[in-house]
């Protein structure tokens, strides 16, 4: 069992739940091998001391292995160690299961896992509204959906592939959505990024109706094909586009948040939680606390060994400078507000935007000529909507661009101590 859909960034397998490429500024190429658990402890302590501590989010991912017992025990140990670091009054506000945990872990394993989570972090009734189980390899049975609901999961995310025959896929998905609605799942999410943009996808979308439609749909990148073919299929049943291939129903809380400016951007993508501390549990997981990222050991044997020694399995990470935090804030503005609030940034950061971002401003002026952006008195409006265009604009503000990006030719990457060769994926 495991998560085969992780993405490779600079030789590191990035967890599939982490938003690529705009969620992990400035990419794992900025990660350093001299960042360790002591640095992570310092950032957690700083976060605990904030007048209004950040919301807490935990996601869990597993690794491919024959015997899950060592992995299950190790992940439980990591949960307890992480929970002990954070102040006891900081409620866990979102929980996400990824990898194959929701699909293939046994009923006893899942019950034990949830018990460990609740013993490690404070959980209240409100936070249970944000428990999400992600399933990626198969559409779960009714019994599995019922178990997840009993355990407290209120959101279910189906990440479909084209492995099943077209007709069977549409019928099975419709049955699963109906069952999830009957069981009381509050949010049903359909992630189609691994579906090829062909007639199978179009027919699948057209098979949805008011009784079987999910609450959110993530569409794939459609390449050279006309995205209108796919957009029309979902818009016909009431979905609205917000950006980065996300379509929402108008009664979705994300839609209201997007309209009133309270939808935020995090390492995990769009969220109603503002600037949360994200704790990744499991082999190869990445955490984001304050201005730092930390990376867990990925080989399962090394991950388990460190936890048996009573150590967090952190093997690297990055600490962002103030300029990095400024750039990350601009990227979030682009993706959530379709604008760059220049006046607000100048007041908050004490900069003159066009001088501080002289090179970036030149590139934005070039995009004005193609009507992708436009200047106004106090800011810059973003008119681009497609994923490639939005990513191109975000990359303008990457001071430490990832390998192969459009910005890589303009700015050299920062120097750092490389990660252990045993970690890097060739």
What are these regions (language model features)?
Residues 387-426:
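Short, amphipathic alpha-helical interaction segments positioned at domain boundaries
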């Amino acid at each position: 069992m495991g998560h085969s859909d992780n993405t490779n960034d600079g030789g590191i397998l990035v967890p599939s739940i982490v938003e690529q490429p705009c969620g992990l500024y400035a990419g794992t190429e900025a990660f350093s091998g001299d960042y360790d658990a002591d640095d992570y402890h310092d950032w957690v302590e700083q976060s605990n001391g904030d007048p209004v501590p950040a919301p807490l989010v935990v996601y869990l991912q597993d690794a491919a292995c024959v015997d899950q017992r060592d992995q299950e025990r190790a992940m439980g140990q990591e949960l307890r160690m992480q929970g002990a670091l954070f102040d006891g009054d900081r409620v866990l506000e979102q929980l996400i299961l990824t990898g194959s945990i929701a699909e293939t872990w046994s009923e006893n394993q899942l019950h034990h896992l949830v018990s460990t989570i609740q013993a490690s972090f404070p959980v209240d009734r409100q936070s249970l509204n944000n428990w999400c189980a992600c399933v990626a390899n198969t559409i779960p049975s009714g019994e599995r959906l019922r178990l997840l609901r009993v355990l407290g999961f209120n959101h279910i995310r189906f990440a479909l592939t084209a492995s099943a025959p077209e007709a069977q896929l549409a019928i099975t998905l419709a049955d699963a959505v109906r069952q999830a609605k009957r069981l009381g799942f509050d949010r049903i999410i359909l992630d189609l990024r691994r579906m090829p943009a062909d007639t199978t996808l179009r027919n699948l979308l057209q098979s949805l109706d008011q009784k079987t439609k999910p609450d959110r749909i993530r569409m794939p990148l459609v390449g050279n094909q006309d995205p209108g073919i796919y957009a029309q299929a979902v818009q016909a049943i009431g979905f609205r586009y917000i950006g980065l291939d996300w379509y929402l129903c108008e009664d979705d809380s994300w839609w209201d948040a997007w309209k009133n400016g309270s939808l935020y951007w995090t390492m995990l993508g769009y969220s109603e939680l503002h600037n949360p501390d994200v704790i990744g549990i499991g082999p190869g997981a990445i955490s984001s606390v304050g201005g730092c990222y930390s990376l867990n050991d990925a080989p399962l044997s090394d991950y388990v060994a460190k936890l048996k020694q009573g150590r967090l399995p952190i093997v690297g990470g990055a600490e962002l400078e103030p300029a990095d935090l400024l750039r990350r804030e601009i990227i979030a503005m682009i993706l959530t507000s379709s604008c760059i609030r220049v006046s607000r940034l100048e007041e908050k950061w004490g900069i003159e935007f066009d001088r501080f971002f002289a090179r970036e401003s030149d590139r934005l002026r070039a995009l004005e000529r193609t009507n992708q952006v436009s200047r106004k008195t106090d800011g810059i409006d973003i008119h681009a909507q497609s994923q490639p265009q939005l990513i191109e604009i975000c990359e303008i503000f990457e001071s430490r661009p990832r390998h192969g990006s459009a910005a890589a030719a303009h700015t050299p990457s920062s120097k750092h101590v490389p990660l252990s060769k045993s970690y890097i994926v060739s």
